[in-house]
Amino acid sequence: MLTVDFIDDNAQIDAKHLPEIERLLIFAAEQEGIDEEAEVAVSFVDENEIQAINKAYRNKDAVTDVISFALEEGEDDFEMSDEPRVLGDIIICVKRALEQAEEYGHSFERELGFLSLHGLLHLLGYDHMNESDEARMFGRQDEILNAFGLRRDV
């Protein structure tokens, strides 16, 4: 089962939102066949912090909504151990999530779910660098969100 660790050093988000994000990520991991013990960290940051991370690691000096860092990237075989599989980190800019929820006409909860799931799918190897990969990733996102009950109209 997936364990989700939340990091919110600057009180960016109301804790009432965390249980649903955790349930969604556990549901998504199950949908993706992650049946062993695994961990993911979800951090909530402000615009300055995500811009600094984006610049340092992606060479893009701009605010973004979500960034993920896969700890297993490029590894084909994972050592068998008693330790949980550490998938990586998902970093969400709360202000961008609020803005995008308003822009897209859905709830803040739906946007948080979308961004959390988007980050998790990146950790699991999905990307959107070309048209076919984007269609695959975004289609999978919609399938999982809808199956979980977090549709666009929510």
UniProtKB/Swiss-Prot annotation:
MF annotations from Gene Ontology: metalloendopeptidase activity; RNA endonuclease activity; zinc ion binding
Biological processes annotated in GO: rRNA processing
Main location: cytoplasm
Keyword set, alphabetical order: Cytoplasm, Endonuclease, Hydrolase, Metal-binding, Nuclease, Ribosome biogenesis, rRNA processing, Zinc
Cofactor: Zn(2+)
UniProt: Zn(2+) binding residues: 118, 122, 128
Lineage top rank: taxon: Bacteria
Subcellular location: Cytoplasm
Cofactor details (free text): Binds 1 zinc ion.
GO cellular component term of the entry, any: cytoplasm
EC number: 3.1.-.-
Keyword NADP found: no
Family membership: Belongs to the endoribonuclease YbeY family.
Stated name of the protein: Endoribonuclease YbeY
Species assigned in the record: Macrococcus caseolyticus (strain JCSC5402)
